[in-house]
Each structure stands twice: as structure tokens, then as C-alpha cells.
Amino acid sequence: DVVVAVGGGSVIDTAKCATLLKTNDGPLPEYEVNTPEDVTAGSIENHTHPLITIPTTAGTGSEVDYWAVITAPDREFKMAIGQPPLYPDGPYLGADVSLVDPELTASLPPRQTAATGFDAFSHALENHVAAGAPELVKPYTRHVMGLVPEHLPDAYETGAMEAREQLLFGSHMAGFCENFAGFGAIHSLAEVTGGMYPEIPHGEAIAVFTPPVMRYNLEEYPARYAEVATAMGIDTSGLSDTEAAHEAVGAVEALIDEVDLPTSLEELGVDEDDLPTIAEKSLETIEIHDNPRDADAAALLEVAQDAY
């Protein structure tokens, strides 16, 4: 009658794809989306099987978004699968009901708490600065960018339920925002790296790429990252947009350090010789199309080298 997904983003994404293939024909790669045109093509023709999602991590927001990420081992690539409703009552990839209870995250170990919590922050960050990000999401993305730095250290260090509740609320809110705004080079590079090195937790790859991508993008869009600084509670009075944007990068790096997340690809065990491939394959992802600053393979290689 219904699929019930209890777990983190990988569990929920797997369940989403199971509900898709229950009611639609073809192998899963036929539903991969790599460009905005792939999304609007409407490859999901039939309503998916009913799905209830129950997240046990505060990170991906997959319980309420229209997307799934599935690794194709033969390609060493993380496929994006997804579709919003393209017309009233149209088919989409996602849950019918989501049950969100912070007590279900109580046993999440510190390392996973840090990685998934930072992933939630990165969703709000990239949704906020994305090319074409609608204004309607920005009150929510601002709130999450303030909420996660406030509560993630406590959740990581003590596991306090109040902190976990706030993180789950932030993750859930950011998940909604994902349905209206895109991501960017952080997720492109991190997902490609995770496809090539499946042992690397997604949130840790996200943490490594976030400051370098911020530095790259703020060169052309400092005002957007100045807003990130304000959202994180930084006093930007008297600062130029560029100065405020660099303060935001510093605050993000401080958060990463505070919860002991990795700070380099070398620390994650990535071979430096793989950086050109990571840059090239990132151009095949759906997320790169919403990066605020244009990026080709050479630019992404520079970002990856900065992350190394």
C-alpha cells in the first residue's frame, strides 16, 4: 500500500526511486536530470507509489524535496533523479507525508551530526546565492544560515535535544527551499567527488568545497555573500560587500573547524591527479547550471586545487 522510508538521505532517496519505478517504466538512468531542460521534460509520467518519509538525520531535507541522488558505480557518478509537479496535481518525485521528530536523531553519532548538519547549512547557502533564486525563499534561507551555526556545535558536542530539534527544523526548511532554488558548484564538485570516492561522506565533501567555492563566486557576486554574513550574525556595518563576503567565508571556516569537519581534499584521501576529472565531470551535473558565477572546467579545477 505504501513505502515507508526511515533513515537518512540515502535511505530516503532509495525509497523515492523505488516508488518511481513501481509506477513508471524503464531503468532508473532514464530519469536522470543533467540540465534544466531535463527537469521540465516531464520524464516521470505517472504518479509515484505512495511514500512516507521519516528522517533520522538533520541534513539532506530529502524528506520534503523533489530530488534523489543515486550513485551509478559503473560511471563513478552520482545521478540526480527528480521532478517537481509540472502542472496542477502532476506527478513528482517525493513524499506524500513526512513525519519529522527530533528524537529520532538522538542516537546520531557526532561525526554524522556534524556532516549532515553542515549539509543543511550548505543547502540554505547555495539556495540563497543561486542564479535566479526567487526572493520567496530568502527569508527561509537566511533563517537557516543563522540557525545552523547557532545550534550545530551544541548538537555535535553534547547531543542536546533542543539543538537537534533546531537542526532538524532547519534541515526541513532548507529542504523546502530546494524545490524553488538551485544549488551550485559546491554540490556539483562534492557529488562528483563522492561518486568517485564513495567512502567519503557527502557532508564532509560539502564542507571541504564550501569555502573555495564561496571565494570563487564572491569575486563577481560579493553582495550575495555579504547577505550570508549578515544571516550568520556578523556585524557588517562599515564594511564593503567584498569585505563582508570574506567575513562570511571566515565564519564558515570557523564553523567547520568547531565541529571538526575536514578542510581539504587531501585529508579526505582524494588523489590530486583526479582533480581535472572532478572538474570536468562537475560540468555534467544539474547543480552547476545554478551557480551564480559561470564556471568552466579550468575554473572548477582552480577551485578544486584551492580545496586540496
Indicate where each model-derived feature is located.
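Gly/Pro-rich interdomain helix-loop hinge
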Residues: 196-199, 203-274
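Glycine-rich phosphate/pyrophosphate-binding beta-alpha loops
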Residues: 59, 172-203, 285-289
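C-terminal and late-domain segments of enzyme folds
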Residues: 109-173
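N-terminal small/polar loop signature for handling phosphorylated ligands or for N-terminal nucleophile
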Residues: 1-29, 153-164
